[in-house]
């Protein structure tokens, strides 16, 4: 039986972590009249996530059904379902926290038979033929992103829970400063190393399950010690 108030919550980034690609970029590349123009501006730090999404959405004319059909073919890490099962078996909450699009994330997860995960992301709204976005997790403390991931971390910690964070990119940087245990790869692993933030590398979610099990046995352990990213 699932614990209604788990002692440990796992927060996992989506784009580049659960999927090898970025869902928003996939949608923009295939369905937006402007393509990746605003995404490239975001990558250069010229605009924030809210402007990137809002301006790009204004050029999308495809239907919800067309986009959903394309998203259904997106691959996920084949070991992610193992993390879902591990969390549920151990009474932990597992949630997705992403600076991406909630509807797109939910569509991909459902296509792989994964249901019921909380998703903290920018909220896609379909209004007839019009596609818009709301930003319920925006906070001025992280102005360049639509989802303030530290805000989500603090939400769980305020309930007395320990938070495990898994990520790979720029929008994850502030969150790792507040998590109890961090798993990082790619750009996020480099950031953690440069900033002296303890973090364990990972190649797949089975490795993460094993390391979390060790940590639960003794949370005082520093799993990142002597474990460079990818080992």
Residue ranges and their predicted role:
Residues 2-123:
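Alpha-helical substrate-recognition element adjacent to the catalytic core
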Residues 79-93, 100-231:
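C-terminal cap/substrate-recognition subdomain and adjoining C-terminal extension
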């Amino acid at each position: 039986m699932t614990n209604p108030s788990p002692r440990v919550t796992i927060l996992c980034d989506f784009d580049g972590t659960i999927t090898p690609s970025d869902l928003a970029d996939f949608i923009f590349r295939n369905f937006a009249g402007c393509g990746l123009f605003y995404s490239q501006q975001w990558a250069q730090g010229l605009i924030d996530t809210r402007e990137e999404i809002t301006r790009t959405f204004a050029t999308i004319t495809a239907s919800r059904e067309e986009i959903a059909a394309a998203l259904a073919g997106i691959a996920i890490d084949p070991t992610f379902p193992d993390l879902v099962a591990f969390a549920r078996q151990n009474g932990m909450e597992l949630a997705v926290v992403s600076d991406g699009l909630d509807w797109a994330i939910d569509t991909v997860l459902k296509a792989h038979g994964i249901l019921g995960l909380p998703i903290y992301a920018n909220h896609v709204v379909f209004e007839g033929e019009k596609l818009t976005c709301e930003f319920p997790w925006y906070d001025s403390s992280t102005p360049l992103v639509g989802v303030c991931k530290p805000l989500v971390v603090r939400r769980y910690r305020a309930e007395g829970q320990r938070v495990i964070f898994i990520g790979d990119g720029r929008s994850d940087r502030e969150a790792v400063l507040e998590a109890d245990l961090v798993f990082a790869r790619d750009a996020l692993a480099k950031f953690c190393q440069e900033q002296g933030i303890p973090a364990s590398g990972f190649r797949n979610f089975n490795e993460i399950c094993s390391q979390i099990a060790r940590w639960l046995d003794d949370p005082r352990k520093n799993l990142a010690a002597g474990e460079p990213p990818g080992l």
